[in-house]
Amino acid sequence: MRIDVLTLFPQMFSIFNHSIIGRAIEKEILKINTVNIRDYTIDKHKKVDDYPYGGGAGMVMAAQPIVDSIKTVKKENKGKVIFLGPKGKTFNQNLAKELAKEEELIFLCGHYEGIDERAYEYIDMEISLGDFVLTGGEMACIPIVDSICRLVDGVLKSSESYEDESFYNGLLEYPQYTRPATYEGKSVPEVLLSGHHENIKKWRKAKSLIITNKVRPDLFKKYKLTEEDKKILKDFNKKL
């Protein structure tokens, strides 16, 4: 997958040179480029923003450097142009899975009070991280790109690494434990030490269902319980 990020602060994306994403870049599974929007301004002082027509607080990113940077990147990257903004569709795991199927993507990070409306003509999709205010689009872009990239084939060692994670299947993840088996008087559940893979699988599913219902009832309501789920919960409750 190739991703180009249009931003005023390309140095912020150096985080992708590390850990799982960094290794995927080294293996050429991923290619993440940053493009400095400021390099495309025709203003002699390298300005990319100006005062809003009609008055108001703050500054607005000008259309010209945004549009020119998009046009240039589009010569090599034919992917969708995604703007990180408050009016967009709220990002979630389903959208991450959808975008992970793409071979190329372009992300546009806004700043200041927003972007000139005329730049929207070159944008295919707008995504919001949530109902809160951030300093700039970069803050939203980093977790969104990370979430998408880790679903690309080959980035993680196996699909099981993400299929069991919170939100992937609509539920929160089950509790995890590691050594020692007992810490400060608290022991790891016996089923996890049993080596019985089917029982472990059922325990994890039951815990995932119970935790989701308790912590995120909104997610639980959307989740469609199967007959197997109901049986797992019933058997689990009998053992309590």
Curated annotation (Swiss-Prot):
SUPFAM superfamilies (alphabetical): alpha/beta knot
Alphabetical GO biological process terms: tRNA N1-guanine methylation
Pfam families named in the record: tRNA_m1G_MT
EC number annotated for this UniProt entry: 2.1.1.228
GO molecular-function terms, A-Z: tRNA (guanine(37)-N1)-methyltransferase activity
Binding site for S-adenosyl-L-methionine: G110, L129, G130, D131, F132, V133, L134
Reactions performed catalytically: guanosine(37) in tRNA + S-adenosyl-L-methionine = N(1)-methylguanosine(37) in tRNA + S-adenosyl-L-homocysteine + H(+)
Subcellular localization: Cytoplasm
GO annotations of cellular component type: cytosol
Transmembrane portions of the chain: none
InterPro entries in the cross-refs: Alpha/beta_knot_MTases, tRNA_m1G_MeTrfase_C_sf, tRNA_m1G_MeTrfase_TrmD, tRNA_m1G_MTases_N, tRNA_MeTrfase_TRMD/TRM10
Keyword annotations: Cytoplasm, Methyltransferase, S-adenosyl-L-methionine, Transferase, tRNA processing
Family label: Belongs to the RNA methyltransferase TrmD family.
Function per UniProt: Specifically methylates guanosine-37 in various tRNAs.
Database matches in PANTHER family: TRNA (GUANINE-N(1)-)-METHYLTRANSFERASE
Assembly with partners or alone: Homodimer.
Name of the protein described by the UniProt record: tRNA (guanine-N(1)-)-methyltransferase
Organism, scientific name: Clostridium botulinum (strain Okra / Type B1)
